[in-house]
Amino acid sequence: MLATDKKQEIISTYKLHDSDTGSPEVQIAILTERITYLTEHFKTHKKDHHSRRGLLKIVGQRRGLLDYLKKKDVERYRSIIEKLGIRR
């Protein structure tokens, strides 16, 4: 799970305006951080299939948000992909 200070740091980096916590960019960045954390977790805990199912759910959520952003604003989509280094 993400620590509160780490989550606040991500929000402050990707927010669009001062009170922004729920824009697609912020949500995608938070999900990407969780995916990175779980990926590292699986390097040492290979048989943790319960958490692996959660990872697949998070990846699906991020995929949906990315599809939404691509449909609404392609420039913002390309920007967040580049900033986060997501392969596409």
Curated annotation (Swiss-Prot):
Extract the InterPro entries matched here: Ribosomal_uS15, Ribosomal_uS15_bac-type, uS15_NS1_RNA-bd_sf
SUPFAM superfamilies listed in its UniProt record: S15/NS1 RNA-binding domain
The coding gene here is rpsO
- Protein name listed in UniProt: Small ribosomal subunit protein uS15
Taxonomy of origin reads:
Bacteria, Pseudomonadati, Thermodesulfobacteriota, Desulfuromonadia, Geobacterales
Give UniProt keywords alphabetically. Answer: Ribonucleoprotein, Ribosomal protein, RNA-binding, rRNA-binding
Q: Which CDD domains match?
A: Ribosomal_S15p_S13e
Q: How does it assemble?
A: Part of the 30S ribosomal subunit. Forms a bridge to the 50S subunit in the 70S ribosome, contacting the 23S rRNA.
What's one GO-annotated cellular component?
Answer: cytosolic small ribosomal subunit
Q: Which family does it belong to?
A: Belongs to the universal ribosomal protein uS15 family.
- Role of this protein: One of the primary rRNA binding proteins, it binds directly to 16S rRNA where it helps nucleate assembly of the platform of the 30S subunit by binding and bridging several RNA helices of the 16S rRNA. Forms an intersubunit bridge (bridge B4) with the 23S rRNA of the 50S subunit in the ribosome.
**What organism does the record attribute this protein to?**
Geotalea uraniireducens (strain Rf4) (Geobacter uraniireducens)
